[in-house]
Amino acid sequence: MAAQTLLELQPSNQSQLSALNTTSCDNAREAWDLLYQVLPIFILTICAFGLLGNLFVLSVFLLLRRRLTVAEIYLVNLAASDLVFVLGLPFWAQNIWNQFNWPFGDLLCRVVNGVIKANLFISIFLMVAISQDRYCVLVHPMASRRRRRRRRARATCMVIWAVGALLSTPTFLLRSVSAVQDLNISACILLLPHQAWHVARIVELNVLGFLLPLAAIIFFNGHILASLRGQGEVSQTRIGGPKDCKTTVLILTLVAAFLVCWAPYHCFAFLEFLFQVRAVRGCFWEDFIDLGLQLANFFAFTNSCLNPVIYVFVGRLFRTKVWELYQQCTPRRPAPLSSSRRKEILRRFWRN
């Protein structure tokens, strides 16, 4: 392949990485030169907005002096996952700026890529959990009152974080900084020990990390939309009124934004697998997949800074919480004294 994807630098030997310069498919050289200069700036911009936005969201949820609801527990974990994710983006921005010459050492090569990979799984699993929670509230409201517990939501989030860390373990173990003599660089690459690992990787990435969660998300949200459309105002009365509907609109928007941002990456990752097993060939496909992966990665990264924007512009209850936090943090002025009360205080003062 002529270049590597940000999340999965894929070559299993140096000859593949050397194809960056030696491949006969050199039609996209100008596009790559432009990408090396422009993409790092965009990634750093996403990092800045994602860092500030997710810190703001976490502050609003965690600083209010009241317990989180079940839905808010999931949203806090989603914001925390996005925050951890954007902390790794400056390393990748510098890596692209250096044309994949990794300057940060072997440990950060493993850690940064492991964190990014874990976030991919944690985010979509949280989307499934959030969708399932809304499904219970809207479609099975009576049962949800007995089953929805904060303790269960926290336990679910802990399991999701653990599974995400487990699925990112191969990335942490197989990533390393290797010298590429032809290019005179040291690249952070994924060294797969056997060709069969390519199949295992695509099953993990596309099936476990997208298709199965996508099926669950479509199932839950399809029933949610059908319930809202079929019950109308009656559903609001049964499930607790407009508050639940506002939360549902926010969550449906978050889910839709996540799928739109991440679907292109998974499509191009599958095309990359087809190219590796020679199911598709030719310079057109090579350039199309390589450039598409880079742009799809950038598009996926935007989701981490898009969620806080959705909270502000779509989440009415979130804006209410922002106002509550402002009032909580703003010192209250004492109420003005009436004239009779003022005279009574002065009389007691002079009497003493």
Curated annotation (Swiss-Prot):
Belongs to the G-protein coupled receptor 1 family. Bradykinin receptor subfamily. BDKRB1 sub-subfamily. InterPro entries: Brdyknn_1_rcpt (IPR001186), Brdyknn_rcpt (IPR000496), CCR1-9-like (IPR050119), GPCR_Rhodpsn (IPR000276), GPCR_Rhodpsn_7TM (IPR017452). Its main location: membrane. GO terms for biological process: calcium-mediated signaling; cell chemotaxis; immune response; inflammatory response; positive regulation of cytosolic calcium ion concentration; response to mechanical stimulus. The gene is BDKRB1. The chain crosses the membrane at residues 42-62, 73-93, 111-131, 154-174, 207-227, 251-271, 295-315. A lipid is attached at residue 329 (S-palmitoyl cysteine). Keywords: Cell membrane, Disulfide bond, G-protein coupled receptor, Glycoprotein, Lipoprotein, Membrane, Palmitate, Receptor, Transducer, Transmembrane, Transmembrane helix. It is a multi-pass membrane protein. This is B1 bradykinin receptor. Residues 63-72, 132-153, 228-250, 316-326 are cytoplasmic. The keyword Lipoprotein applies. Glycans are attached at residues 13, 21, 184. GO terms for cellular component: external side of plasma membrane. The keyword Disulfide bond applies. This is a receptor for bradykinin. Could be a factor in chronic pain and inflammation. It is found in: Cell membrane. Residues 1-41, 94-110, 175-206, 272-294 are extracellular.
